[in-house]
């Protein structure tokens, strides 16, 4: 999204301190190069993750309320642990805890508006990047304490319920049998989830995987990928096919028999064959950590071009723990999914 700048003000793309510039934006002006500029008919959401300014809803190319206040939010209800979100422009009636239920409600309303046309063979596409369970971890009061574990677990339960609302709307509109639903994530679990508390109650968000969000390890990149497509994908089946989130583009294009231009989706490989039980086309995957360290996976083999996590877990980049470690890491994920034995 490209925001308009107030007359006489300047905004540098190279400035890494947002507070130096966020008040130079003219939030009353239309937003350029947003979702409506790249093919979406309607957009309702926020500008980024819920710990980033501005704190206001956006509908199509306009904010729904001017962010005239300078506020932040606790990263977690009832605790100072985790600190606060980035302070910045906030709409007067905006509350971070309202975002999840609002996006769920708006999604259900969108499905209801499209239902009649969808039943008449005019399909719709809904992309819902939820702001949860990303920080700030702020379930609404009716969900606080529900898990009996910690705020993150409460937030996960509320997120699950929001997904359930959307599936229930498809049921009510008699669209379930002809709708492809994909539930996935953009990264592995974050340490903000207080993983130790979860583990003490028998919950392990990353299972046997090493590392977490930001790392080069599988715990940072391997995420759930759940598909529901009645009549096309048998329930409770599992696939070992490698899938990258970039592959959704080519897959949807193949389903719609809509060829992609040569200069679009170059890194996208359709996984439609895998959905139908056949061998998938992707045999490799390139990923990188938050500090730009790269890894490539081919078959069971994974080569990480760094001696460390490349992210937030140990051994951290530049830490003395990396002294004497091999410059690269090689793992056989078929035998060592937890990446404990570097074969290099």
Task: Please tell me what each predicted stretch does.
Residues 1-89, 191, 284, 309:
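Catalytic-site neighborhoods of secreted/periplasmic enzymes
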Residues 10-26, 91-123:
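Catalytic-adjacent loop/helix segments of enzymes that bind and process anionic phosphate/sulfate esters
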Residues 89-101, 145-158:
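The substrate-binding groove and active-site-proximal loops of carbohydrate-active enzymes
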Residues 81-92, 141-146, 228-232, 334-340:
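Short glycine/proline-rich turn/loop motifs
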Residues 53-54, 58-62, 70, 107-154, ...:
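Active-site His/acidic residue clusters
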Residues 18-50, 191-195, 199-216, 233-237, ...:
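C-terminal cap/loop subdomain of S1 sulfatases and analogous C-terminal strand-loop tails that border
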Residues 38-41, 119-126, 175-181, 222-223, ...:
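Loop/turn elements at helix/coil->beta-strand transitions in domains of secreted/extracellular proteins
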Residues 25-28, 35-36, 136-139, 145-155, ...:
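Histidine-centered active-site microenvironments of extracellular/periplasmic hydrolases
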């Amino acid at each position: 999204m490209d925001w308009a700048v107030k007359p006489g003000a300047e905004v540098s793309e190279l400035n890494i301190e947002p507070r130096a510039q966020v008040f130079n934006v003219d939030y009353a002006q239309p937003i350029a190069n947003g979702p409506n500029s790249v093919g979406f008919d309607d957009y309702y959401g926020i500008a980024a993750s819920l710990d980033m300014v501005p704190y206001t809803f956006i509908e199509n190319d306009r904010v729904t309320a001017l962010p005239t206040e300078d506020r932040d939010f606790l990263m977690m209800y009832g605790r100072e642990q985790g600190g606060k979100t980035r302070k910045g422009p906030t709409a007067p009636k905006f509350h971070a805890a309202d975002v999840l239920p609002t996006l769920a409600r708006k999604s259900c309303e969108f499905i209801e508006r499209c239902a009649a046309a969808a039943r008449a063979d005019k399909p719709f596409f809904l992309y819902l990047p939820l702001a949860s369970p990303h920080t700030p971890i702020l379930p609404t009061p009716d969900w606080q304490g529900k898990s009996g574990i910690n705020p993150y677990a409460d937030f996960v339960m509320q997120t699950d319920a929001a997904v359930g609302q959307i599936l229930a709307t498809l049921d009510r509109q008699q669209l379930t049998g002809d709708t492809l639903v994909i539930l996935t994530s953009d990264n592995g679990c974050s340490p903000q989830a207080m993983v130790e508390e979860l583990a003490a109650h028998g919950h392990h968000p990353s299972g046997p995987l090493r590392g977490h969000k930001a790392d080069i390890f599988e715990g940072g990149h391997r995420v759930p990928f759940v598909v529901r497509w009645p009549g096309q994908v048998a329930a409770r089946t599992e696939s070992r096919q490698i899938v990258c989130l970039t592959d959704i583009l080519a897959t949807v294009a193949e389903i719609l028999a809509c060829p992609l231009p040569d200069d679009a989706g170059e890194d996208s490989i359709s996984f439609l064959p895998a959905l139908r039980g056949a061998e998938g086309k992707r045999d490799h995957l390139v990923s990188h950590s938050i500090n730009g360290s790269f890894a490539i996976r081919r078959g069971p083999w994974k080569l990480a071009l760094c001696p460390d996590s490349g992210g937030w877990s140990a051994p951290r980049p530049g830490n003395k723990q990396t002294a004497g470690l091999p410059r690269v890491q090689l793992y056989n994920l078929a035998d060592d999914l937890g990446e404990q034995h570097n074969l290099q």
